C-alpha cells in the first residue's frame, strides 16, 4: 500500500509539472501585457467593441474595477436564483430559492467559494447552472488571477504607479487561458461519459424493477471550469463522487490535475516575470513539500481503518466509509488534500467520514490560508504574503531592512501583510465561537461531542478561506448559517484582496535595489525552509487550540 501511495503521488506531481510549465510561459506573457501569438488583431477588435482603452490603472482604479465587476455579478446572480421559476430552461419547474439561500449561493460563487447549502439536481434549473453559476466560475477565477498579476507586476516594475488594465487582464485571462483549457477538459469529460445536454430528467426502471429518475443537464461544461478555476461547486449534490460528474479513474486524475494546473503554472510564470526562474521554483518547492507531507498523513490515517468498526468486530482493514470503490482509499485521500490545499472544495469522498486525523489535515490546509498551491491566483498571492512575512522575520534576525526581489519591505507593506494574514483566522475563530454560543448555530449539528464541533469549525474554515467543502453532518441551510457563512465568504475574499492590492500599489512605485553580500537569497534551501516554517508557525499558533477541541480530542477518544 505504501508503494502504491508513493507511485500515485509521484506520478501526479510529474504529470502536473509537465503540463504546468508551458502554461506558465503563456501566463508570463499575459503578466507582461504581451498578446499571445495570433490574437493581437482579435484583441484590437475586442477593445474597440467593448470600449476598453490601453490606459493603465493605479491600484485603487484596478481594485475598483474588480469590485465593480464582482458586486454587479453578485446582484445579477441573486436575481437569477431568487426568480428562477420565471426563467427559461427549467424542465423540472423548480421554484426560486429563498432570499437567504439565494444570497448565500450568490456570494459563494462570486467569491470562488462554491459552498452549497442545497442539492443541485433538486434545487437549480439549467439556466441557473449555466447563466448563473458557470459564468461566475469563470469570472471569480479570472478575478483571482488578475489580482496576482497586479502583485507580480508590483515586484517587476519600478518607479511607476500603474499595475496594468484590469479589464484587459480579465478578458485575456478568460478568453485565452480559462476558456480554451476548460473546453479541452469538457470534451474529455464528455468522451468519458459525463452528460452534456438540456434534456428533462429521464425515468428508468432498475434491474430490480424499481422506478428511478436520472438527472440530466449540461454537466461536463460546468465540471471543467469547476475544477480548472478551483471553484468546486458540484452540478449534483454528491459532487465529484457522483458517477455523472466523475465516472472513471481517468476523469478523477484529470480533475485533480485541473485543480492544481493554474496554481502550479503561476509559480513558473512568477519566476519568468521576475527574471529569475529560481524564485518561482522556490515557491513551488515549498508548496510541494507541505503537500506531500499532508497527503502521506491522510493516506496513513485512512489506511489504518475505522476503530469503531474494528471494535464492533467488523473487517475494516482500511477506512472505506464514505468513499467510492471505483477510486479507493488512496485516490480519495489524494483528492481530499488536493481540493483543500487549493481553494476548490470539490470532493470525491465524504470528508465527514474520514478518520479524525484524516479529516483534520484538510481542515488545517484551509485554515493556513490555502497557500499550498491554493486557488487560481489567490494561492500565489497568499503565499507571497507569507514570503513577505518570512523576509521580515529574517530581517529582524540579521538586523537588516527586509527586501524581496530588490524591493524594500517597509512598515506600510508589513501592516497590510499582517492585516491580510489575520483576516481569515479572525473570521474562523469568531464565526465558530458565535455558532457554538447560539441555539441557531448548535441546532444544525447532527453529531455531538468533538466531531460535532469539528463540523462547525470545518464549515466556517471552509467559508472564510473560500474553499466550499464541508463535513456533511451539518444542516447549514438555515437563515443563521446562510447569513453567517455568506459574511465569512465575502470578507474572507475581499478582506484579503484589498490589502494585497494596497501592497501592490506601494511596491510598484519603489526602485529595485541591487543585490549585495548582505541580501537574503530567496531562492535557496535555507529560505524555502524559513518559508515553510513561517507557514507552519502561523497555522500552529492560530488554530491548535481549536483543533485540540475537535479532531484531536476525537482521535484520543477512539477505542
Swiss-Prot record:
Chain ranges passing through the membrane: 5-25, 27-47, 63-83, 132-152, 170-190, 253-273, 283-303, 327-347, 356-376, 379-399, 416-436, 484-504, 524-544
Name the UniProt record assigns to this protein: Potassium-transporting ATPase potassium-binding subunit
Family named by the database record: Belongs to the KdpA family.
Cited InterPro entries: KdpA (IPR004623)
Keyword tags: Cell inner membrane, Cell membrane, Ion transport, Membrane, Potassium, Potassium transport, Transmembrane, Transmembrane helix, Transport
Coiled coil: none
An annotated Gene Ontology molecular function: potassium ion binding
Function: Part of the high-affinity ATP-driven potassium transport (or Kdp) system, which catalyzes the hydrolysis of ATP coupled with the electrogenic transport of potassium into the cytoplasm. This subunit binds the periplasmic potassium ions and delivers the ions to the membrane domain of KdpB through an intramembrane tunnel.
Membrane topology (UniProt): Multi-pass membrane protein
PANTHER family recorded: POTASSIUM-TRANSPORTING ATPASE A CHAIN, POTASSIUM-TRANSPORTING ATPASE POTASSIUM-BINDING SUBUNIT
Cellular component aspect of the GO annotation: plasma membrane
Gene that this polypeptide is encoded by: kdpA
